[in-house]
Amino acid sequence: MSEELKYELPGLERKAHECESTRPEGPGDATKPDELATTASVYGKLMASAAKLKATFAAGDREGKRIAAAIRAAAGAYQKIEEQKAAELNRQMNGSDAPPPAAEAVVPDMSGIPGPLTIPSMEYPSAAAAADEMDWEAAARIIHSGDTQALSMKYFRDQWRDYQSTLEGHGRHFANPAEGWSGAAAETCAEAQRRLSTWWADMGAECGRLAQEATTFVDAHDKLVANHPTMDDVKAFEEAEWESEWDRQYAWAIKQEKSEDALEAYANGSQIQEIRPGKPPSIGGLPAVNDGDVQATPTSTTGGPGGPGSGSGGGSGGGASGGSGGGTPEMPELPSTDPSMSPMSTNSAGEEQSSGSPSSGGSSSGGSPSGGSPSGGGAPSSGGMPEGGLPTDMPGGPDIPGLDDPSLKPASAGGGGGGGVGGGGGGGMPAAPLGPAVGADSVSPSPSSTRGGGVGVPTGTGGGAGGMMGGGMGGMGAGHGQGQGKEKKRDPKLAPDEDLYTEDRAHSEGVIGHRPRREKDSGKQQ
């Protein structure tokens, strides 16, 4: 049974209710401060921009309702998937052996969702304002008989300025997607919410622009009122007693020039720009909801200690790959060898050997025969056969060449167990050249075969041990290589014993050419 879809019906309903929340009411209209032609033109442009914004906001409100309906439609589809899964669970609980039917994808029902709202086209007054050409007395009466402080337009400006933050706050209702659900339908709704939230923030900026255009208008009007002749000027002119008609005409011309300058400055200073808001983003259809839209989180990992893939392999027996572990142990890689070198000579030529090389037989109790001398003359003082027998849990080498490989050398090549002295196996010479082939005359004891007070006399069991354990590796006299160089002493605490090579192939006798031993009654060998 597939994993459960992640959704919470109450959480989705809360988000849907939030998306269809009512937007705070926007600013209302304003009245013209006077009846000048310039004023009427600018006022008409401001009202056209405000009406365009309001119609666009209504389209945004529709999109919020459409997103809310889409969330509810997706929740219904998710619920149908859950019903399918519940029916499947009941079928399994009743013991049915029939194969479970595949869960059908459910397409959210968007049929009841209204379409996007079309924003009506509105004509923006683009013609230039007619020039206010009139007597200064008539202009003064028009200007000063109206709203000289332009209080209505200033209130209009302040409302739109404050509405910017209101719209930004309204857009935050859509910023965060619904919690507790996921899947393709959830991502579609969440993306629609984010786009609409950004759009509302942009509409807030458009409100700020409209407020700035209104500020341009009221500032120009304030200058007009301040610079234009007033009604007191008209009264004073009419009540004045002029000495001559020339004086009267001269005074009138001065007032007319002042009026015209003020009106021209007003017309030039009240030029505003049209506000052109973009239409809101529209959510389309929702993708089908499938069982398994939510990716399952892995609850367990393959393998474990001693299990498949764990890389651990237990067991005993030197060189054996088997054991009591749960899986096949990984074999360590052997160092790459030159075809002209035997496996053992590769090791001795490349690095120092920390201890005697274990035999491939994996003897668990054998050791150096008591009284015998250690094999592999010239080996470090800490080398040789461990006292407790050969070490166990030594992995075998998987890449050993075959017997017919031309790279193999005779069994006598390389430092192995002492042919004439049958102690231990595989204690080769570190960093020493290859020894000559062993003949029948080269395996007899020599005066130099003793080391450290030991007697280099072959024993009855030593030869057999040398043949069994050092097969293919021995072939050098017990004293061969004595004194060829000083070995660095190894600290077993810092450099523990490490299996560098394990012999795992058919081998030849390591004591070729031995003559039958004769024992006397005294127990001495001859």
Swiss-Prot record:
Record's compositionally biased regions (Basic and acidic residues): 1-23, 485-508
Cellular location(s): Secreted
Compositional bias ranges of the Gly residues kind: 303-328, 363-387, 413-429, 451-484
InterPro entries in the record: EspB_PE, EspB_PPE
Segments of skewed composition (Low complexity): 335-362, 393-405, 430-440
Region (Disordered): 1-35, 91-110, 271-526
Null allele phenotype: Loss of DNA conjugation when disrupted in recipient strain; strain still secretes EsxB.
A Pfam family matched in the record: EspB_PPE
Primary location: secreted
Sorted UniProt keywords: Secreted
Any GO CC annotation of this UniProt entry: extracellular region
UniProt miscellaneous comment: DNA conjugation in M.smegmatis is unidirectional with distinct donor and recipient strains; mc(2)155 is a donor strain while MKD8 is a recipient strain. Mutations in a donor strain that alter DNA transfer do not always alter DNA transfer in a recipient strain.
Described purpose of this protein according to its UniProt entry: Involved in DNA conjugation, at least in the recipient strain.
Protein family (similarity comment): Belongs to the EspB family.
Protein name listed in UniProt: ESX-1 secretion-associated protein EspB
Species for this entry: Mycolicibacterium smegmatis (strain MKD8) (Mycobacterium smegmatis)
Taxonomic lineage from the root: Bacteria, Bacillati, Actinomycetota, Actinomycetes, Mycobacteriales
